[in-house]
Amino acid sequence: MNLFNLDRFRFEKRSKIEEAPEAAPQPSQPGPSSPISLSAEEENAEGEVSRANTPDSDVTEKTEDSSVPEPPDNESKASLSCFQNQRTIQEYIDLSSDSEDVSPNCSSTVQEKKFSKDTVIIVSEPSEDEESHDLPSATRRNDISELEDLSELEDLKDAKLQTLKELFPQRSDSDLLKLIDSTSTMDGAIAAALLKFGDAGGGPRKRKLSSSSEAYEEDEANDDQSLKKPRGDRREESNESAEASSNWEKQESIVLKLQKEFPNFDKQELREVLKEHEWMYTEALESLKVFAEDQDVQCASQSEVTNGKEVARNQNYSKNAAKIKMKQKISMKPQNGFNKKRKKNVFNPKKAVEDSEYDSGSDAGSSLDEDYSSCEEVMEDGYKGKILHFLQDASIGELTLIPKCSQKKAQKIIELRPFNNWETLFTKMSKINGLSEDLIWNCKTVIQERDVVIRLMNKCEDISNKLTKQVTMLTGNGGGWNIEQPSLLNQSLSLKPYQKVGLNWLALVHKHGLNGILADEMGLGKTIQAIAFLAYLFQEGNKGPHLIVVPASTIDNWLREVNLWCPTLNVLCYYGSQEERKQIRFNIHNKYEDYNVIVTTYNCAISSSDDRSLFRRLKLNYAIFDEGHMLKNMGSIRYQHLMTINARNRLLLTGTPVQNNLLELMSLLNFVMPHMFSSSTSEIRRMFSSKTKPADEQSIYEKERIAHAKQIIKPFILRRVKEEVLKLLPPKKDQIELCAMSEKQEQLYSGLFNRLKKSINNLEKNTEMCNVMMQLRKMANHPLLHRQYYTAEKLKEMSQLMLKEPTHCEANPDLIFEDMEVMTDFELHVLCKQYQHINSYQLDMDLILDSGKFRTLGCILSELKQKGDRVVLFSQFTMMLDILEVLLKHHQHRYLRLDGKTQISERIHLIDEFNTDMDIFVFLLSTKAGGLGINLTSANVVILHDIDCNPYNDKQAEDRCHRVGQTKEVLVIKLISQGTIEESMLKINQQKLKLEQDMTTVDEADEGSMPADIATLLKTSMGL
C-alpha cells in the first residue's frame, strides 16, 4: 500500500480488546495523516481498525474471521438518518501526527460483535443520501464541473478502484465498485470499505491492549471531549475533510490527464513529478516533454489517445529504464539550482545508481546512502574480506578517500599493519587514539565508489569493443568505413586526410547514438571537421536545427568558416544586445527565420532567463560547444545552465581535454553523456579529484586512476596531435629565458616577500593566499604593477594640485587622496600625463623600463626584427600590455593590440590587418582574449611575457601560430623571472602537461595484434 493512503487512515485511540492477542504487538512509528471521522461509543469493545506503517509485502494474508461485520442495513440507515435530522452529535478522531497513542498491531483474529442500537457510526464524508438532503446543489455542480467529460469520470473511477485494491487486495473488483458507486468521494468509499470489510490491509490485526485502566479512562475522557465539541467546530472539520477529498480528486484527475500524454510512466511516478512542480500541470508537462525528447521516450499524441484509453506503442526503451532515467533527470534539477520552489528531494540519485542497468546484483551496487557508522551492523563476509584487504594494502592516498580519514589517521593505519583477520583489525583500530571502528565501516563507501567506476569502465569498454568490431568487420569485408567529403562542401576546398578520419569518427559515434569529444590538438581544424559533419547530416536528411556555442572572440571566425565551407547551410547569428536578441527570439518563435544552424556565444546562450528558456524550448538536433574545456567544472553555474539546452546530441570541441586534473575530463564526459555518468557524479568526483604528481612520485593507485580514466574516455574522445598527423607541419621549438631581475626590482621583491611571509601564518582563506601569490607574480613581472615610487606625501601634494583642474575644482582632496592610494605606480604615471597641474610628477623612462624581463625582451626583439621574424606577444595582465606599449614605442616597433576590451566586431579586422600587413612587427594580445580560435600563422615567434597557472592556456596561445597554414619553424619563448614564484609555477605546469601525455599516449599493443585505436582502424579502413 502506498504511503499516501496509509497515512490518511490512521487512528489515534487505543483501548482494551476483550480477547488477548495471539501474537505480540509490534509498534509502528506514527506518520502524518489527514482527519477522518469514524468512531462509536463502543468502539473499544469492537476493536480498532488500524494500519501499520509497513509496505504491502509485509502484510500477512487476511483470514476469513478477521473482518468486522457490517451492521444491518436498517440499523445503519437509522443511525445515519438520526444524524441527518438532529445533527447534534458528531465524533471526530484526531489523526494528527502528534499522537503517541497510535500503535497498530498484528493479531490473528478480531472477535465479531454486533453493533448496538445506540451505536452511531459517522464518517466525515457524507453518503449519497446525506449529500442529496443536506448539501446544496451548487456544491454538487462544482464537484461535477471539475471533471470535463465522461472519460475523465471513468478514469477517476478507475483511480479510486486502484486505490481500494491496494488497501483491500483480497476483495473482488465488483465489491469495490459497488462501494465506489454508493459513495461520492474517495474518503467515503474507503470509510465504507473499512466498515464492511474491516482491516484494510488484508492481514489479521488486533488493537493493542491498553497497559492500564488509566489508559482506558483517558480514552473515555477523550470520547466525552469529542462528543462535547461545538457544532461549528464539527462543521469546520467536516468542511476541511471534504476539501481534502476534493483536492485529492483534483490531483488524481491531473495525474490521469498527464498519464494520457506519457503512458510509459505509472501514476506514482507522475504524482512525484507533479509534486516537484507544485501540482502545476503545464510545468510538469513541459518538464516531462523535455525529458522525453532527450531520452527518445515518446509521449502519446492526440491521435494515439482516444476516448480516454491509452494506445500501446513501440518504445525505444523499456518501461523500467525510462523510469530510472526520469529519476536521474529529475534528481539533477535541484543540483542545478533551477527548481527553487522545491521543498524536498523526491528522488535519490544514489538509489538511481542502485536500480540502474549497471546493477550486477552484488552488494557493490547497493545504495551509498546507507548508514555504515553503526558498529553493530552485520557485514557480509564478502565485504569483510574486501575491507580487510583494502586496509592492509591501500596507500596513504587511497586511505584518505575514506570519509573522515585524514592524512595523519591514514599514516596511523599503515603503522598498525598487518591485519591478519577481522578480529585483529577491530582490536587494533579500537585501541589507538584518534582511530575508531567508524573508519572500518566507512571503507565500504570507498569500495562501492570503486565498484561504480569499474562498472563505468566495463560499460565503456563494451561500447569501445562494439565500435572497434564494426570497423574491423567492415574492413575485413573489403567495404571499409569511408565517408567521402560531403558534396555540399565548397568544391574548391578539400579536407585533409586526418580531417576525413575525424569526419568518419563523428559519423560512427552518431550512428551508435553516442556523443563525443573531438579533442584534436589546437590548429588541426576542428572547426572545419565540425562543419563537414553538419554537411554530412544535411545530406543524410538531418537538416537541423543545430546550435553552435562559441567564445565571443571566435564568433566572427565561425560565421566566416561556415559561409566559406558550406554556404548551403542557413546560419542564424544569435548575438547582440538584449533588445536585439529579443527580436531574434520573436522571429524564431514565430518562424520568421529560416535556419539550419544557430551560432551564439556562451554568454548570450545563458545570460538571461529568456535566453535560457529559448534553448530549453527549441528542439535541437546537435549542440556543438567550441572550446569545450570551458565546461571543465561541473559545479559551475555556466555548466548547469548549459546542461539544460534541449539538444538530442552534443559534441564538444577542445584542444585541451585534460588540464589540471582528471576530474575536469570527467566533467566533459558527464556533459556529453549525462545519461551514463550523471548518476555517478559523486563517485567520479571523489575518485578523480586528487591533484596530479610527477611521474616519479606517482603511486600504483595514482597510475591505476589514469588507466581507469583512459579506459572510460576511450569510446567518446578522438585526440590527435600534430606530430602524428602533420608530417609536413614545421616543428615548434620551446625556449625558456630565465631573466635576472634588476637591482631595484630584486630589492622590492625581497621586501614584499618578507612582509607577506610574516603575515601568511594568519591567513586562513584560500582567496587570501591567492592574493599573496598574485602580488608576488606582479612584482616578478614589473615593479610598476605595485605602488612604490608614489609615496603618501606625493599623493597628498598631487591631490591638492588636482583642485586646480577644471574637472576637480569642487572636489574633496581627501577623497582624491583615497582614490590615488589604491592605484599602481603606472596608473598614477598615466594620470600625471593626463592632467596638466600634476604633469611634473610623471615617472622617468628609466623607471618604466627598469625590469629584468624588459631588458631581456628588448634584446630578443632587436634580434628577431633583424631576421625578418614576426612576433605575437602575450601577457596575462592588461596593465602589463599598457607598459609593453611604452616599451614598443620607445624602441619604435610597429604593433597592434587586442584584449578583452576590444569590441568583437573589431577583432576580426585587427587579425586580418596583421596577417596582410607584413610591416607590423608585433601583435600584443592578452592570453585569455587572444588565445582562443584566432589564426595568426603569419607570425612565427610567440613570446609569453608571463606564464599562466594553467599551462593549457599558454598552449592555446602558442597554437595561434603553430597550426595548419604555418610555413616557418615556430619559436615559443617563455620569460621567467629568476628566483621568483614563476619558477615554481613553471615546474607545476610541466607536471600538468605530463598528465595529458599519460592520458593521450596509446598503449603499445603486442606485435602483430589488431590495433585497438578507433582512429587507426578508420585510417586503415579508408586506405590512408
UniProtKB/Swiss-Prot annotation:
Crosslink (Glycyl lysine isopeptide (Lys-Gly) (interchain with G-Cter in SUMO2)) position: K77, K333, K469, K722, K994
Positions of post-translational N-acetylmethionine modification: M1
Motif (DEAD box): 1003-1006
InterPro entries hit by this protein: CUE (IPR003892), Helicase_ATP-bd (IPR014001), Helicase_C-like (IPR001650), P-loop_NTPase (IPR027417), SNF2-like_sf (IPR038718), SNF2/RAD54-like_C (IPR049730), SNF2_N (IPR000330)
Catalytic activity as recorded in UniProt: ATP + H2O = ADP + phosphate + H(+)
Database matches in PROSITE patterns: CUE, HELICASE_ATP_BIND_1, HELICASE_CTER
UniProt subcellular location: Nucleus; Chromosome
One term of GO molecular function: DNA binding
Domain spans labelled CUE: 156-198, 250-293
Record's protein name: SWI/SNF-related matrix-associated actin-dependent regulator of chromatin subfamily A containing DEAD/H box 1
Species in which this protein is naturally found: Rattus norvegicus
Name of encoding gene: Smarcad1
